[in-house]
């Protein structure tokens, strides 16, 4: 079994991604052919469930873009279901310390290395037991990425990086900036300093640093610092801003206004 995304991170090849929040297999397939290295199927803030994640995995499968799935929480039951429908790479949100990082890894591994329940006869991941030796090879194909999104997590970064089985650490700029007292302003100098220091520390530990940043200059800056998986946009934002720009060119006025948001 192979995991092309995990292999790319191990080889130190930067991977450029797009965030998927439309929770729709049709739009997922549309962007799967756009040329991104990876696509994040968001189960934390988008209206996804196991079934919608499954259909998006199926839609993306024929294309070179690699799927990454974010569960809503570091929950072994939910993680088990996502792995069974075919997710190999998980982005686990709001990991605060090494114990929680170890829990995330354990949820992705079959015993004795972890606690993943065995149900391969029912699982798309094993192609319903048509993949020879799936139960013995699946553990090595798993890619576990954990999110650090608070000052507490930042203070525990060194111990998180020591956890065996963690392939990458993703910095969540939106929640981090809020936790630092700068909600909606991840570009604040204090937040940027924390992000940049974390990227350097993660890379120095031999793990892959990751982040979501739609600001092109900042995204390129993070890549220069050593970030290896960087999402540079969100499908909902692309659709909303693109639709607004098209309408504006023909004289339409925006009916709603509000905060510009982080992405």
Curated annotation (Swiss-Prot):
A divalent metal cation binds at residues 149, 175. Transmembrane segments: none annotated. Binds 1 divalent metal cation per subunit. Its cofactor is a divalent metal cation. One of its GO terms (molecular function) is 4-hydroxy-2-ketopimelate aldolase activity. Its EC number is 4.1.2.52. Homohexamer; trimer of dimers. HAMAP family: HKHD_aldolase. This is 4-hydroxy-2-oxo-heptane-1,7-dioate aldolase. It comes from Salmonella arizonae (strain ATCC BAA-731 / CDC346-86 / RSK2980). The lineage of its organism: Bacteria, Pseudomonadati, Pseudomonadota, Gammaproteobacteria, Enterobacterales.
């Amino acid at each position: 079994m192979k995991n092309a995304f995990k292999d790319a991170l191990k080889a130190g090849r930067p991977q450029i991604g797009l965030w998927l929040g439309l929770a729709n297999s049709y739009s997922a397939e549309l962007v799967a052919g756009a040329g991104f290295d990876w696509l994040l199927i968001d189960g934390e803030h988008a209206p996804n469930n196991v079934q919608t994640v499954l259909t998006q995995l199926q839609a993306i499968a024929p294309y070179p873009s690699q799927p990454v799935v974010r569960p809503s929480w570091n929950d072994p039951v939910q993680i088990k279901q996502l792995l069974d429908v075919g997710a190999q790479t998980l982005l686990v949100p709001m990991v605060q310390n090494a114990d929680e990082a170890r829990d995330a890894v354990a949820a992705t591994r079959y015993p004795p290395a972890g606690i993943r329940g065995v149900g391969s006869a029912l699982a798309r991941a094993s192609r319903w037991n048509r993949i020879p030796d799936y139960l013995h090879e699946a553990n090595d194909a798993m890619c576990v990425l954990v999110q650090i999104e608070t000052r507490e997590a930042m203070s525990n970064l060194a111990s998180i990086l020591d956890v065996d089985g963690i392939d990458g650490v993703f910095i969540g700029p939106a929640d981090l900036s809020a936790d630092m007292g700068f909600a909606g302003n991840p570009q604040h100098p204090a937040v940027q300093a924390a992000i940049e220091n974390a990227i350097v520390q993660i890379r120095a530990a031999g793990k892959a640093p990751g982040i979501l940043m739609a600001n092109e200059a900042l995204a390129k800056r993070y890549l220069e610092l050593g970030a290896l998986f960087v999402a540079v946009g969100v499908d909902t934002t692309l659709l909303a801003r693109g639709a607004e720009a098209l309408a504006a060119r023909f004289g339409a006025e925006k009916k709603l206004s509000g905060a510009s948001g982080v992405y």
